Amino acid sequence: MLPPMALPSVSWMLLSCLILLCQVQGEETQKELPSPRISCPKGSKAYGSPCYALFLSPKSWMDADLACQKRPSGKLVSVLSGAEGSFVSSLVRSISNSYSYIWIGLHDPTQGSEPDGDGWEWSSTDVMNYFAWEKNPSTILNPGHCGSLSRSTGFLKWKDYNCDAKLPYVCKFKD
């Protein structure tokens, strides 16, 4: 058995070891977690890791894409899932409901020369494995070759549109 004078020093040593153990374990846990986005560019909103912003100054599709690229890690928005599409739709509806169409990063650089509308791609080069067409562009007589969201679908569905038209646009900022 320890003498009574040794108990406070043993207790102090034990407490010090426990504090150190907690700190070390906490550091390991923090390293395993992915770091969340700390902040979004001014005027944008986060959804998961990327941030999104609606710009109301109308531009052609090409000028809108360039405007997004001038911002850090920016591209016209690519909509990769129904959940992301719902977020973008709510962002657009919360800021403006006075426009019929909004540019997204979808375009057909082949100008319709691919069979069955297979030339469509995201300007961000994200893989296209989610589709939300209002109407399949390959079935349209005079299709545009740039993608937009249409108000008639609550900004949930994509519509091909004339690339030279001047529309508001949504940028997506990846970290």
From Swiss-Prot:
UniProt binding sites for Zn(2+): H107, E121, H145
Pfam families xref list: Lectin_C (PF00059)
Free-text tissue specificity from the UniProt record: Predominantly expressed in pancreas, where it may be restricted to exocrine pancreas. Moderate expression levels in testis and weak in heart, kidney and placenta.
Keyword check for Glycosyltransferase: no
Alphabetized SMART domains for the sequence: CLECT
Post-translational modifications reported in the UniProt record: Proteolytic processing by trypsin removes an inhibitory N-terminal propeptide and is essential for peptidoglycan binding and antibacterial activity.
Subcellular location: Secreted; Cytoplasm
Cross-referenced InterPro entries: C-type_lectin-like (IPR001304), C-type_lectin-like/link_sf (IPR016186), C-type_lectin/snaclec_domain (IPR050111), C-type_lectin_CS (IPR018378), CTDL_fold (IPR016187)
Disulfide bonds: C40-C51, C68-C171, C146-C163
Propeptide residues, chain positions: 27-37
Motif position, EPN: 114-116
Entry function: Bactericidal C-type lectin which acts exclusively against Gram-positive bacteria and mediates bacterial killing by binding to surface-exposed carbohydrate moieties of peptidoglycan. Restricts bacterial colonization of the intestinal epithelial surface and consequently limits activation of adaptive immune responses by the microbiota. Acts as a hormone in response to different stimuli like anti-inflammatory signals, such as IL17A, or gut microbiome. Is secreted by different cell types to activate its receptor EXTL3 and induce cell specific signaling pathways. Induced by IL17A in keratinocytes, regulates keratinocyte proliferation and differentiation after skin injury. In parallel, inhibits skin inflammation through the inhibition of inflammatory cytokines such as IL6 and TNF. Induced by IL22 in lung epithelial cells, inhibits cytokine production and regulates allergic airway inflammation.
Designated name of the protein: Regenerating islet-derived protein 3-gamma
